[in-house]
Amino acid sequence: MKFSQALLSLASLALAAALPHASTPVYTPSTTPSPTPTPSASGSFATTSGIQFVIDGEAGYFPGSNAYWIGFLKNNSDVDLVFDHMASSGLRILRVWGFNDVNTAPTDGSVYFQLHQDGKSTINTGKDGLQRLDYVVHSAEKHGIKLIINFVNYWDDYGGMNAYMRAYGGGDKADWFENEGIQAAYQAYVEAVVKRYINSTAVFAWELANEPRCTGCEPSVLHNWIEKTSAFIKGLDEKHLVCIGDGSDGSYPFQYTEGSDFAAALTIDTIDFGTFHLYPDSWGTNNDWGKLWITSHAAACAAAGKPCLFEEYGVTSNHCAIEKQWQNAALNATGIAADLYWQYGDTLSSGPSPDDGNTFYYGSEEFECLVTNHVETIERSAK
């Protein structure tokens, strides 16, 4: 999901427009001990079985949500509150940002995970860095919630690919996927995060990027990057699933102008399942069209013999009336194994969590419609 920073209630991060450097980035290793969470006694690693997901030994259809912001919270009680509410509501999967890239280190105590500056990549493992994600993983383990952890954003929110290009060079997003220096910095970060949580059963999947695309590129650019990067991750960690995080065909439905080929990506052995997003308002289509979008992706996944994750979907009004149709379409489509609405909202110690217009909050009528009732429908269908 692309969203405006002006809509975020969390403190925005300062990004400096540093001049590009042609040098190969130098990865600065962490000197802070990494308190890697211990796997929960009752949990097991998520896997797939044909076109289904298997969570803690249970094969079926699973509901979940997105809360990109949870790793940036500095109050542990807020993190626990979110997972308490999710678990009691029957939500099983939460997708979070495992990235927070800056070109200038914040001086106000804001959380950031990686600094790209002067051709160097420095991973922040301090209390305002990956230790915040550590607690998210720890709390997820405690509450039985599975996490999808994403490594970089296509969009500029929380740094994104442009934060890399400002530090290491590159003129457009195509350069990001093919520039050796950029990819060295990216892979160093991926390796650090994967190794940090490699033994955690709370991790559902590693995700390459949020909505990666390459406007005007041949599909081979993205495909080759997906193939190379997913193989790199599998070489580090064979225990966890790997997915792309693509919105599928970009902002222009059923076209390849964004350099994405959904069906072709499903053929990559080191990609375990498909992901796709749905925002008709942003794409100039009507809400009813969304059901076709869902069933077409389900068919592609079924043909490939891999599960589909309906990973993001949202509207800014009439949540229940519109999104309920999409949930039902996904639940009844052969090939879809889970759905994650965008996005989860809750009342934290500092006030409401971020609202980008698509958010609906725990305890609201919309939450009852799209979470409580949806979970009940899933449970009935499993009997």
UniProtKB/Swiss-Prot annotation:
Optimum temperature is 52 degrees Celsius. Substrate binds at W97, N210, E211, P212, R213, Y279, W283, W342. Its EC number is 3.2.1.78. It catalyses: Random hydrolysis of (1->4)-beta-D-mannosidic linkages in mannans, galactomannans and glucomannans. GO terms for cellular component: extracellular region. GO terms for molecular function: mannan endo-1,4-beta-mannosidase activity. Optimum pH is 5.5. Glycans are attached at N75, N199, N332. Disulfide bonds join C214-C217, C301-C308, C320-C369. One of its GO terms (biological process) is mannan catabolic process. Residues 1-18 form the signal peptide. InterPro entries: Glyco_hydro_5 (IPR001547), Glycoside_hydrolase_SF (IPR017853), MAN-like (IPR045053). The active site is at E211 (proton donor/acceptor), E312 (nucleophile). Keywords: Carbohydrate metabolism, Disulfide bond, Glycoprotein, Glycosidase, Hydrolase, Secreted, Signal. Pfam families: Cellulase (PF00150). The keyword Signal applies. It is an enzyme of class 3 (hydrolase). Its main location: secreted. It is found in: Secreted. Endo-1,4-mannanase that catalyzes the random hydrolysis of (1->4)-beta-D-mannosidic linkages in mannans and heteromannans. It is a crucial enzyme for depolymerization of seed galactomannans and wood galactoglucomannans. Active against locust bean gum and gum guar. Also has transglycosylation activity. Belongs to the glycosyl hydrolase 5 (cellulase A) family. Monomer. This is Mannan endo-1,4-beta-mannosidase A. The gene is manA.
